[in-house]
Swiss-Prot record:
The active site is at C50 (nucleophile). One of its GO terms (biological process) is protoporphyrinogen IX biosynthetic process. Catalyzes the NADPH-dependent reduction of glutamyl-tRNA(Glu) to glutamate 1-semialdehyde (GSA). PANTHER family: GLUTAMYL-TRNA REDUCTASE 1, CHLOROPLASTIC. NCBIfam families: hemA (TIGR01035), PRK00045.1-3 (NF000744). Keywords: Chlorophyll biosynthesis, NADP, Oxidoreductase, Porphyrin biosynthesis. The record marks H99 as: Important for activity. This is Glutamyl-tRNA reductase. Homodimer. NADP(+) binds at G198, A199, G200, R201, M202, S203. It catalyses: (S)-4-amino-5-oxopentanoate + tRNA(Glu) + NADP(+) = L-glutamyl-tRNA(Glu) + NADPH + H(+). Substrate binds at T49, C50, N51, R52, S109, E114, G115, Q116, Q120.
Length: 435
């Protein structure tokens, strides 16, 4: 068995490819079920964010397992495998383990050290367990990866001042507005006519950062207006006007800066829609949804500038140099966690031998105890029998302690296999085919 990962990210694929493979929360269960239907995939889990889709699997054969996952991705996205493959990466065993831990720590993020990815890995673990698609191996890997992410953030300054996708989007708006006014740097958003479409987690973060950059009034649109109203209640210091999506066109005409972050699977703002709206001023769209909420063709309009998540690199590169230095320290911590996981997994090789040894010794204990008790006669009380029973169990546990500890201790594969063979031979644990 081997652990593999197949996926794509902002490093390997542009947003127009990533959005075709984005798996929304409501489709995760069915996708996990489809992946588990492949006979060579024993355990599987899916990580789907705006910047990456990664599928982790415990497979019988690494090459067959990777091919199966690629086949699933092609079927799901309706993109031919030959077209898709150049954008995919795959890692096996040690590299796959290290990759997940680096992802969890924020070391592979567009925004180095961003914190949201850790909660996304936690959700990945929860969904795998709820759908019973993960087992002891992936559950342990995911749990240890979460621990690695927490450790990096606790023991280094990697996350200090780290921007998120949402804060990078707000900074991009500041930069572009500044450039329009001949200013090289970040400008206040006070006075900007801001529209936020969507009322989920990303929109909450957007409003938080908009507030910190001077925005004191905005319009919030959502399909479910009650959700928008509930979100606005968390920001009493900002004037937030809540509306339904049916007022999108009118709201756009009253805005100078529009952020979109919804779970829509298709763009709902395109050039045709914009042409039917009477725009009176220049307008900036910043779309952080994946799949994208805004069609690329809106850029053809003379009054519109449109940006998506791939355009955030301009902001991210401004403050990456400092965290790149800290990332080296963080990566050493992650590699330590990888070693701990791999040693644990290697120790599982000893479990069948340990279980057989325990089983054989328990059988001997029971047989010899029964012989002894039968010689004691009826005068031997039930309480005394319990004492003797506990005594014999304690002796067996004492005998097993040293060999079991040795078999489970960190050692090379060759050393462990040699130890296992010695134990099997000394205690006659081998079956007839092995002898």
């Amino acid at each position: 068995m081997q652990i593999v990962v197949v996926g794509l990210s902002h490093r390997t694929a542009p947003v127009e490819v990533r959005e075709k493979l984005s798996i929304p929360d409501q489709a995760i269960s069915e996708s996990l079920k489809s992946l588990r239907a492949y006979s060579d995939i024993l355990e599987v889990s899916i990580l789907s964010t705006c910047n990456r889709l990664e599928i982790y699997g415990l497979v019988k054969d690494k090459n067959i397992g990777i091919s199966s996952i690629k086949e699933f991705l092609s079927d799901y996205s309706q993109v031919n495998c030959e077209v898709l493959t150049p954008h995919l990466f795959d890692f096996r065993q040690e590299e796959a383990v290290l990759h997940l831990m680096k992802v969890s720590a924020g070391l592979d993020s567009l925004v180095l050290g961003e914190g949201q990815i850790l909660s996304q890995v936690k959700k990945m673990m929860r969904l795998g367990q709820e759908n019973q698609s993960t087992g002891p191996i992936l559950n342990r890997l995911l749990s240890q990866s979460v621990s690695a992410g927490k450790k990096v953030r606790a023991e280094t300054n990697l996350g200090t001042g780290a921007v998120s996708i949402s804060s990078a989007a707000v900074e991009l708006a500041q930069l572009k507005i500044g450039q329009d006014n001949g200013i090289d740097g970040l400008v206040s958003l006070k006075g900007e006519k801001v529209l936020v479409v969507g009322a989920g987690r990303m929109s909450r973060l957007l409003i938080t950062h908009l507030k910190s950059k001077g925005c004191n009034k905005l319009t919030l649109l959502n399909r479910n207006i009650d959700r928008a109203i509930n979100l606005s209640g968390d920001f009493p210091d900002i004037e937030i006007i809540c509306k339904g999506l049916d007022e999108l066109d009118k709201s756009i005409t009253l805005s100078s800066l529009v952020f979109t972050s919804t779970a829509s699977e298709k763009p709902f703002i395109d050039l045709e829609r914009i042409k039917n709206i009477s725009l009176n001023n220049k307008l900036k769209f910043i779309d952080i949804g994946v799949p994208r909420n805004i069609s690329n063709d809106v850029k053809q309009h003379d009054l519109i500038e449109a940006f998506d998540v791939d355009d955030l690199e301009e902001v991210v590169s401004r403050n990456q140099e400092f965290r790149q230095k800290i990332a080296k320290e963080a990566e050493s911590l992650v590699k330590e966690e990888r070693i701990i996981f791999l040693e644990w997994w290697a120790s599982l090789e000893a479990v069948p031998v340990i279980n057989k040894l325990r089983s054989d010794l328990e059988l001997i204990r029971k047989e010899e105890l029964q012989k002894a008790l039968s010689r004691m006669g009826p005068d031997f009380s039930a309480r005394e029998r319990k004492v003797v029973e506990a005594l014999t169990k304690g002796i067996i546990n004492k005998i097993l302690h040293t060999p079991v500890t040795k078999l489970r201790s960190p050692q090379s594969r060759e050393e462990r296999q040699a130890s296992l063979k010695i134990v099997e031979k000394l205690f006659s644990l081998m079956d007839d085919e092995q002898k």
